[in-house]
Amino acid sequence: MAEEESDQEAERLGEELVAIVESPLGPVGLRAAGDGRGGAGSGNCGGGVGISSRDYCRRFCQVVEDYAGRWQVPLPQLQVLQTALCCFTTASASFPDECEHVQYVLSSLAVSFFELLLFFGRDEFYEEPLKDILGSFQECQNHLRRYGNVNLELVTRIIRDGGPWEDPVLQAVLKAQPASQEIVNKYLSSENPLFFELRARYLIACERIPEAMALIKSCINHPEISKDLYFHQALFTCLFMSPVEDQLFREHLLKTDCKSGIDIICNAEKEGKTMLALQLCESFLIPQLQNGDMYCIWELIFIWSKLQLKSNPSKQVFVDQCYQLLRTATNVRVIFPFMKIIKDEVEEEGLQICVEICGCALQLDLHDDPKTKCLIYKTIAHFLPNDLEILRICALSIFFLERSLEAYRTVEELYKRPDEEYNEGTSSVQNRVRFELLPILKKGLFFDPEFWNFVMIKKNCVALLSDKSAVRFLNESTLENNAGNLKRTEEQQGLDEGFDSLTDQSTGETDPDDVSGVQPKGHINTKKNLTALSTSKVDHNVPRHRCMLCNKEFLGGHIVRHAQAHQKKGSFACVICGRKFRNRGLMQKHLKNHVKKIQRQQIAAAQQDDQEVTALEEINCSSSSISFENGNSDSKDLEVETLTASSEGNKEVIPEHVAEFIEIPISVPEDVIENVIENGSPNNSLNNVFKPLTECGDDYEEEEDEEGDYEEDDYDLNQETSVIHKINGTVCHPKDIYATDQEGNFKCPALGCVRIFKRIGFLNKHAMTVHPTDLNVRQTVMKWSKGKCKFCQRQFEDSQHFIDHLNRHSYPNVYFCLHFNCNESFKLPFQLAQHTKSHRIFQAQCSFPECHELFEDLPLLYEHEAQHYLSKTPESSAQPSETILWDVQTDSNPNQEKDSSSNEKQTISLPVSTSKSRKESTEPKTCIESMEKKTDSLVQNGNERSDDTVSNISLIDQKMPDIEPNSENNCSSSDIVNGHSEIEQTPLVSSDPALKIDTNRIRTENGSILPSVVPQEHNTLPVSQAPSKPNLTSEHTSYGLILTKPYVRPLPPSYLDERYLSMPKRRKFLTDRVDACSDQDNVYKKSVKRLRCGKCLTTYCNAEALEAHLAQKKCQTLFGFDSDDESA
């Protein structure tokens, strides 16, 4: 029955193939040349020339595949191929010899014949119907020999030899018999590698694994056939099917490249072998993760994710497998492909898992891989685009790693956004994950941005920029600032023009120079101002500056920005003159001064061409002068001399602000100096905060000559005016600490030194360098710093102790270790703290010379060192008396000077203990200090006449209250200044003439005597004229007359201990004291009888109030329970 059906199928197939030739389906293409002659075996088919070879081959293949696919056994399929080959042989007679379509069809038929012959042995070749089929095949091959198809000839030879399995070399290989590799390779080269692949597939399909492995190994050992990846895939398949061969599986895995492995995995998955592909993928992936190799890692992880989900669709299992593979990874970069597949495959929870993976990766040691760390920060910012706080932290972290201008721009853009509160409802991750991530992110920051505003963040970020980025940033910032200033100038000029035009129209006046009436007056001035402001853009003759360090030229003020590129740690050099500085601010001011000098030269030249005022006159008009006697100013002569000398040395025009920083020369007459000292008055300028000797001592020699070259910009003024200090509980301005002249210049407090300075910083450098042993200098420095070291926050009570301690903070490593025989010092305090932990037993040695005591506790060491200096305090009290005597010599009365100086010596020579000084520093000042406020006008107007002085002081004396002569509390008990106490027990006004003080002498805070020219009759005043408000007190010290504000007594909790403020506990007295109480006390102790309402329980003091309450009948029972009424 099956044979009849196959015969019928063969007849129908022949008819369809003949119909293809007779009725062409495709367009006429390349026609075959021929006359339609038929060949052997072509009795069933007719010839024709109406169809092209390409169309015929295409239709032929479709029909043959259709009929062959209807059978699942090899013999009927061989019959279909026999009929197809005979029909093709007849039709191909008209086709050309070198037609590629014919070659393709013949090769396909030959390979199909070979694949079906694998199912038959040698014995079956001589039986019907296989014998007839093979004979027809050989006959057709003889007619098709002109095409020279290799595969067809190979199949014909194999049929003659008895079949595909009958070759003796192949039999030896399959049976694992020893054979020479050369003979095996020669046999393998004699056939098409595709035939060996078909043999291996047949053996694997029949589960003949040993024979298949033997054949596959022989093919792999062949140099040419081994390039075919199928044999490697087949070997892995065989090893996968035999678990005993695990060692061979791993060995061959190591020999296979990952790229080839990916192709093998994909081919295995196409064949439906998912488990084999998954095991192969994991076998290739895990060694890559363990070795940290990123070669083909993205492809392997992606293929693994697809195979894992195909084998097990569970999302939780998938995530667990991802974590398991991540634990085996040694390269942190593998988190990126894993996060990619997790985010794609696990929908909602995938984002949170990815954020957690990033947080875990940041906890690893990534110091050697900043690029990967930046990628992690950028990934977190990509995952959480709506969390502004995390975005800012990530942007700052990226900037700290890259130090690029683009990273800074991102930080600036994020911090310019308005702050947003974190909303847990709209967050992409859970609150737990976010708050675990925040401290991890902040670990990479140099500071916590929550405690800094954007101004501080910008300042520190710009300082961290690299050289090229810093120059680019400064260039862009300067261009933006110039554009903004130019725009504001144009707007202001436009407003001025509009105002001028309105004024001209309202008054009816016209501009004679404006003929057209369109252009207003201010337009010409606007052009001049814009030209002066932006000379670098308009004028082509812009001066060029050459950098001395790199020999590059820059236009105009670009040299200032270029200087940022040459900054080094602890050293800043001027790129124009080469001068070195240790402070960046001083270097920048010095460099800007160079540029402004040249700019002023150009402006002065332009103004001179326009016949306006010359540059020298403009500088003299705008500069501040030094006030001399009776208010006359001789600063012009001094400025002209200074300008001439400076122009000869530097060949540059000195700016107008230089005169403010010029010191008074030593050659000034003594009377002029005394007048400056006596008439000096404070103003509102404030200077830089005091720097210790260790920071400023090295730079003083090179910066002292440049004191007149630094400009005083608004930023410095705003920064300086915010510095205030507290002395004895009151806010004190620096002018109250330092003596100043009428122009606000600060005088050196040293004994016999007459130099004055414009800024406190310069004064401090001069005083600490030139007069390091002067007592007044030490006390002034002590007072300015409030006795506290700004590095270690240690409090000192002795000025010499304070100065000696500051000398130990040597720049740049200012934080030193106190341990015995340890000379380590550090720049930052946390470095010192880490170093201190390295000492197992901390023992600090006393820093006093010739003292070698060791202490384990710092408080004990501090107390011990203070005892050394307290013992030296009485010996050093003679120098202030000399200073006071030098101060008083300016008075005209020599007798009074002698008396006051002798009294002062007695007062200061009294030693005062340190504890007493601290206690008395909180006490209020005496009424003598109330004179400060009224004498303020005297000191501010230093050039007033003596008559005005007499009248001012007389007014002060008239308002001084009378004090009872027998009252000890009204005396000036103690005046504490700079930690020293001056005790004065003499009352201000007394009825006893022997106890009256000299009214021509007024004691000030520092113990000096203030001479007075008030007549004697104004000294005593009635008690009724006591002032209602405290007055100011004038202070005449060794370096001038100073006014101090009245002392305002602070609240008791600020200076008293709690035991003096809290209410004492009540004590029980003896019974005899209780019985001794008077009858009057017993009367007050009697209790008053009170009346209460029975219902609402309201209490009343008398019966009338209770009756009025009851008469209203509005009260209700407080506890109204029915059960109580019934029981009653």
UniProtKB/Swiss-Prot annotation:
The modification Phosphoserine is found at S1123, S1127. It comes from Homo sapiens. It comes from the Eukaryota. InterPro entries: GH-ZnFinger_Regulators (IPR052251), Znf_C2H2_sf (IPR036236), Znf_C2H2_type (IPR013087). May be involved in transcriptional regulation. This is Zinc finger protein 654. The keyword Transcription regulation applies. It is found in: Nucleus.
